[in-house]
């Protein structure tokens, strides 16, 4: 038989054509790693990939790939580069190295949370280590800093990947090439000879071919000054029915068997007449994704009934399509917008069971769900598309029935839909253990991995119903030296465990450490100096022999580490108690003996908040619907103005005993002044007016113009306005899809016109924009909370708590949202969980700088919730139980006025300023006012909260503003998004609150929040 191999040098596909069989598809181009500058100046050139080297070694049905990348910085100052790279489905990172002082230093596997915390602590010191971590699905990322001025930095990423198999059993390996000018590009590929594997065919490198060298086929290519226009492909056509590989590493022998299942004798199942189509219409879906999915839809029966269920952040009402044409038309008119929530989809599927054949078209990237979900008994067949995807999660969700359109044509996919393949039932044989691959679909080619425990083993694959493969003999004496198969086994096990990473964290960590695998539970980190390895108690790689010896000699004993940790914990708790006692002392006697009248000057010349009605938003205190000030987000660098107050950042985290609050909150003169004030009822009569903000961006103006064109009368009803506004939003989205500000601004507009469902959909795009970005997720959740969308906000905040468990703010945010939902719904479960999270934020001995002040705020809020709960009439036995704590902390500090300001960016300083009715200003340099106003600790390191407290508020207008002072964050992604919550009669039965979210565009930006009027 003569085969003709043709590789198409394009970015999408390479096709293997055979004369007597259907073409076998080699997967589309896998995106190559990309590097981008972080916080560049407008006049700077971006960092770039200068050289790119790939070494690949095929072993059986797998390949190990080492990619070495040199990134260059053509600018006059050091820059940071962010490297992002999706891998093939089923691949795992198994090695990472960074050049340190010109020497490549291997990364070591560390628990993911520990690695990230260590990395971020070093970032704050201005000396970045190297970190590579699994994001979600096949997405990985790393950061490179510093890339020296007019210099370069080298990183290395190793991964192991299964070969891509076409339905006819042919195999291929695709090595992604960046489409950028390279000073040097080198490619080295090795394929073993034997086992019936034919001579491989090389593509993407012109007329270069493999050459035989000893027991392998080898190709080595080095090009200079080249711009790749195609990926490098290695095709293994006409693969034998069975391919076996055996490797030896240390004292273990690992094997892989790749087998073509026996042909099914059963007749093809006819396609049904009724279908359920689950269509992922989230914002991350691309035109290419839809085109590939539509190719399958177009092959479904025309005369059939289709139930179309569109899902994003929420599931839409099902639509019935009487023909395939109606279905296609409906899909053509379905916008791609919003986040993805598989939990919502699974809830729909369970609540609306069907016997109809169900197809799920998606990439599997669940950005809003809270974890593992289950479709119940009738699991769908997933049709997967997308460059970034989560095949492992989909296989678990769908019982293994996943069709990857990167590996199959639409017609081949239809055959699988019409006659679903059986699964591999088992593997038979003595002398083998730890077999991976059981349960996979038996189509095209089936691959299993395992460990050989004896000298020899005869292995047969069981396809069920008495169908067994021919025996494959595995011999220890045939083993080559190598780690590919052992690492591939570990990667396969990790992929199996990853969809339930929280439940399998210990095993994932053990596998990661033993086999060097990055997973949802593990990352790889590289430090530059010995003290960093010691500080974070991370063992250096054995390959750095001298460093490892110094670390071993210098490392404190386990007893010493435990003692130091206990001393740190006790010191933290002692400081917490001292500061809480100072807070209570202020509350008992809030008037200072010696008032200080300095002013910041920020209120001078500021437009009065009683200005034009377009700039005002006065709403009932019951609601949390303040309009957001949204300014387009863009990358920013440290401002020169920041250095003028750098001393504020350099202060020690722990305050000295007897600081301003503790030392000046009492005195007879304070009592005398308070006695002269007019009597006022316990609960103040107050109103709050928040300052609405119109960002006046071109996209919002276009939306408003479209709505204005409706005119008046019947056309201007709420439904028509929302429909026209959303249509124009979709037009603008094509231009601004990458801008977080766009979604925040537009969501604010839709909230403003009472189109809440559309607003929630729009804001949920933030979760799709940057996977697992806690700042972006916090912003999204805060805006949802502001709108009263607690369920959606809580799902995101639970994810943030998993991403940032070392930050008290994660648990305080969760507690606040549970608190508010619990009060609204009179939910004992929510109230109890809120109390538990307040308690965690308050009494954990956090290591984070300024965590102490978040803890104090959490104690205030915990006591307020306990008091509220005590006033409710709960069903007998259902009253939420308050967590146990020292009696010294059980004190309700109720207030006439409380204002809390929090923000979403770390290492960033935002200040709260309040101008009291008598003209005295409370701010970080004047914390205690003569009438008893109290500004809490100045948080300069990010997140807040900062508070203004007023126990007994004199009558008058209190003006509030936020000032964006500066940031020392090296990689500031954009302006700070702040949320202000204004309370009156806080902690009392008639407590009222109002929330406003806004974004501060640039350093020194001062923004009016609003007025509090006490009557």
Regions found by a protein language model. Give the residues of each.
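Von Willebrand factor
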Residues: 269-324, 345-346, 350-362
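Alpha-solenoid helical repeat scaffolds
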Residues: 741-745, 775-779, 809-813, 852-854
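An acidic, Ser/Thr-enriched
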Residues: 95-139, 143-148, 154-278, 382, ...
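N-terminal, polar/Ser/Thr-rich
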Residues: 18-60
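Intrinsic-disorder/low-complexity signal
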Residues: 868-1015
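Short beta-strand-loop
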Residues: 268, 308-332, 367-373, 391-394
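VWA/integrin I-like adhesion module and closely mimicked acidic/polar interface patches used
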Residues: 333, 362-417, 475
């Amino acid at each position: 038989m003569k085969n003709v191999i043709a590789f198409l040098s394009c970015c999408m596909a390479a096709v293997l054509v055979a004369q007597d069989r259907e073409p076998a598809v080699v997967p589309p181009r896998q995106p190559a790693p990309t590097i981008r500058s972080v916080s560049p100046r407008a006049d700077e050139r971006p960092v770039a990939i200068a050289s790119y080297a790939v070494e690949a070694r095929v072993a059986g049905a797998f390949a190990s790939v080492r990619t070495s990348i040199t990134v260059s910085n053509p600018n006059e100052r050091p820059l940071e580069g962010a490297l992002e790279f999706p891998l093939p489905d089923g691949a795992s990172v198994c090695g990472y190295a960074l050049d340190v002082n010109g020497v490549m230093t291997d990364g070591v596997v560390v628990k993911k949370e520990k690695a990230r915390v260590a990395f971020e602590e070093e970032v704050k010191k201005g000396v970045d280590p190297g970190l590579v971590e699994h994001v979600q699905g096949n997405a990985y990322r790393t950061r490179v800093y510093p890339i020296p001025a007019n210099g370069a930095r080298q990183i290395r990423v190793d991964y192991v990947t299964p070969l891509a198999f076409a339905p006819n059993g042919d195999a291929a390996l695709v090595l992604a090439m960046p489409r950028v000018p390279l000073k040097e590009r080198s490619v080295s590929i090795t394929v073993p000879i034997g086992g019936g594997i034919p001579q491989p065919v090389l593509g993407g490198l012109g007329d270069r071919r493999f050459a035989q060298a000893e027991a392998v086929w080898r190709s080595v290519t080095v090009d200079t000054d080249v711009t790749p226009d195609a990926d490098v492909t290695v095709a293994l056509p006409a693969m034998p029915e069975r391919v076996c590989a055996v490797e030896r590493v240390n004292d273990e022998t690992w094997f892989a068997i790749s087998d073509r299942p026996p042909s099914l004798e059963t007749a093809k199942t006819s396609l049904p007449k009724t279908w359920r189509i689950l269509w992922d219409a989230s914002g991350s879906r691309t035109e290419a994704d839809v085109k590939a999915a539509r190719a399958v839809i177009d092959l479904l029966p025309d005369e059939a009934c289709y139930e179309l269920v569109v899902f994003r952040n929420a599931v839409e009402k099902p639509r019935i399509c009487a023909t395939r044409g109606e279905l296609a038309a409906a899909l053509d008119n379905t916008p791609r917008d919003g986040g993805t929530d598989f939990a919502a989809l699974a809830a729909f599927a369970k609540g609306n069971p069907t016997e109809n054949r169900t197809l799920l078209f998606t990439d599997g990237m669940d950005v809003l769900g809270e974890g593992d979900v289950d479709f119940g008994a009738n699991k769908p067949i997933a049709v997967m598309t997308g460059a970034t995807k989560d095949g492992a999660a989909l296989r678990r969700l769908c019982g293994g029935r996943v069709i990857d359109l990167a590996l199959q044509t639409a017609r081949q996919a239809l055959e699988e839909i019409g006659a679903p393949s059986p699964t591999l039932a088992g593997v038979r044989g003595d002398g083998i253990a730890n077999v991976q691959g059981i349960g996979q679909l038996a189509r095209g080619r089936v691959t299993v991995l395992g460990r050989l425990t004896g000298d020899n083993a005869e292995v047969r694959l069981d396809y069920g119903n008495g169908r067994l493969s021919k025996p494959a003999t595995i011999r220890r004496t045939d083993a080559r030296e190598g780690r590919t198969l052992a690492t591939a086994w570990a990667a396969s096990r990790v992929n199996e465990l990853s969809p339930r990473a929280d439940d399998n964290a210990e095993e994932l960590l053990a596998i990661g450490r033993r086999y060097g695998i990055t997973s949802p539970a593990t990352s790889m980190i590289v430090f530059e100096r010995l003290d960093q390895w010691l500080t974070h108690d991370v063992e250096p790689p054995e390959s750095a022999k001298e460093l490892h010896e110094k670390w071993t000699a210098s490392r404190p004993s386990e007893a010493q580490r435990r003692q130091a940790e206990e001393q740190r914990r006790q010191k933290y708790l002692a400081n917490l108690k001292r500061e809480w006692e100072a807070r209570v002392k202020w509350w008992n006697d809030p008037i200072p003996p010696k008032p200080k009248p300095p002013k910041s000057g920020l209120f001078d010349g500021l437009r009065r908040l009683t200005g034009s009605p377009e700039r005002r938003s006065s709403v009932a205190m019951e609601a949390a619907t303040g309009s957001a000030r949204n300014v387009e987000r863009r990358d920013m660098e440290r401002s020169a103005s920041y250095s003028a107050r750098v001393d504020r950042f350099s202060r020690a985290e722990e305050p000295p005993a007897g600081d301003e609050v503790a030392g000046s909150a009492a005195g007879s003169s304070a009592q005398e002044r308070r006695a002269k004030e007019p009597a006022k009822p316990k609960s103040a009569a107050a109103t709050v007016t928040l300052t609405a903000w119109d960002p006046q961006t071109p996209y919002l103006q276009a939306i408003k113009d479209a709505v204005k064109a409706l005119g008046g009368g019947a056309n201007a009803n709420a439904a028509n306005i929302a429909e026209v506004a959303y249509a124009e939003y979709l037009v603008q989205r094509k231009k601004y899809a990458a801008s977080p500000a766009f979604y925040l601004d537009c969501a604010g507009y839709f909230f403003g016109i009472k189109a809440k469902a559309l607003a929630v959909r729009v804001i949920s795009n933030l979760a799709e924009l940057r996977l697992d970005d806690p700042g972006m997720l916090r912003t999204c959740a805060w805006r949802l909370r502001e709108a009263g969308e607690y369920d959606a906000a809580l799902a995101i905040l639970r994810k943030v708590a998993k991403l940032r468990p070392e930050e008290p703010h994660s648990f305080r945010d969760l507690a606040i949202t549970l608190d508010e939902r619990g009060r609204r719904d009179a939910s004992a479960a929510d109230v109890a969980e809120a109390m538990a999270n307040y308690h965690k934020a308050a009494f954990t001995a956090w290591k984070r700088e300024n965590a102490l002040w978040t803890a104090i705020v959490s104690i205030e809020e915990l006591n307020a919730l306990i008091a509220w709960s005590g006033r409710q009439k709960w069903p007998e036995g259902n009253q939420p139980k308050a967590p146990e704590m020292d009696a010294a902390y059980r004190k309700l500090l109720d207030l006439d006025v409380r204002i809390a300001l929090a923000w979403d960016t770390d290492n960033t300083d935002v200040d709260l300023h309040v101008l009291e009715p008598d003209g005295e200003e409370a701010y970080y340099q004047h914390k205690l006012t003569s009438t008893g106003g109290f500004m809490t600790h100045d948080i300069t390191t990010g997140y807040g909260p900062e508070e203004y407290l007023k126990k007994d508020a004199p009558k008058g207008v209190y003006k509030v503003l936020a000032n964006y002072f500066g940031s020392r964050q090296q990689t500031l992604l954009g302006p700070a998004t702040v949320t202000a919550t204004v309370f009156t009669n806080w902690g009392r039965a008639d407590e009222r609150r109002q929330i406003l979210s806004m974004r501060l565009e640039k350093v020194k930006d001062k923004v009016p929040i609003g007025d509090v009027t006490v009557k």
